[in-house]
UniProtKB/Swiss-Prot annotation:
It comes from Mus musculus (Mouse). Residues 1-26 are annotated as: Disordered. The modification Phosphoserine is found at S19. The keyword Magnesium does not apply. This is Protein dpy-30 homolog. The modification N6-acetyllysine is found at K35. It comes from the Eukaryota.
Length: 99
């Protein structure tokens, strides 16, 4: 019986070659998913470079720019360019995921 348990333990170690470093299967899956997502995002960035100008702008700048211009028109600040620049910088994180 003990030999069967040892074999089972050895089988588990063999299934996870990085267990000696303390990596669990779930951590390995997370790492693999991150690698896949990184590859997809790099492919997407390449795709952005190959887009026509209008499509590139529509996917990258237009969404945040329209929202910023809407707020600008509503608030009508005395320094609209600085206001818009500040708005874009403050809110860029919301839109970076989409690029």
């Amino acid at each position: 019986m003990e030999s069967e348990q040892m074999l089972e333990g050895q089988t588990q170690v063999a299934e996870n070659p990085h267990s000696e470093y303390g990596l669990t299967d779930s951590v390995e899956r997370i790492v693999e998913n991150e690698k896949i997502n990184a590859e997809k995002s790099s492919k997407q960035k390449v795709d952005l470079q190959s887009l026509p100008t209008r499509a590139y702008l529509d996917q990258t700048v237009v969404p945040i720019l329209l929202q910023g211009l809407a707020v600008l028109a509503k608030e009508r600040p005395p320094n609209p360019i600085e206001f818009l620049a500040s708005y874009l910088l403050k809110n860029k994180a919301q839109f970076e995921d989409r690029n």
